[in-house]
Amino acid sequence: MALLKVKNVAIRGISACVPEHIEENIDLPVFKEGEAERVIAQTKIERKHTVVDGITLMDLFEQAFEKLVSELQWERETIDAIVVVSNSFEYIVPASACVLQGKLNLSEDCHAFDIRQGCPGWVIGMSTLSSMMSTGFIKRAILFAGETTTLMNSPLDKETRPLFGDAGTATALEFDENATDLEFLHGTR
């Protein structure tokens, strides 16, 4: 395992957005009688938020971003970089981060790129972005992480459909020489 220690970067805030629509696991058409109850008892997951009616991951990211920068009172032109981490990209080309940069009216000088990762994505995105920021050339950045997993798996999938919902998050990072070190332990199994 690789231990990465990053200095001079602070987490200033985190905002999350989930879609309004709720899917009940008891109602999934894939289960035979009694199966849904067993899955719910084992996983403790009765329901999850899912996208419908054209809601996209970008929409969830945008709402999380607007709430976050409003609470932090950050001006858009002070954001130097954004990174989007997901397996649910809506675009192959251009990068989703570049599309989001335009949608959020961020500066054309704002560095924007994607990282394709699933479960460890937020940690990998945090370690990558904070490492870039630690020298002080990037003062403020936003890490977007999220999935619209229900668009990728079938309602007839017994393995993943009952487990994963949809959400988008925005995490604000800022260069700060007095910040507590961030530590990341990386490995792959």
Question: What spans do the regions from the language model cover?
Answer:
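Flexible, glycine-rich active-site loops centered on histidine and acidic residues
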Residues: S134-A167
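Condensing-enzyme catalytic core mediating Claisen C-C bond formation in acyl metabolism
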Residues: M1-G54, D157-R189
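Beta-strand segments within the central parallel beta-sheet cores of soluble alpha/beta enzyme folds
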Residues: I11-R12, E77-V85, H111-D114, K139-G146, ...
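Acidic, glycine-rich active-site loops and adjacent beta-strand->loop/helix elements
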Residues: C17, V85-E90, Q117-P120, A145-T150
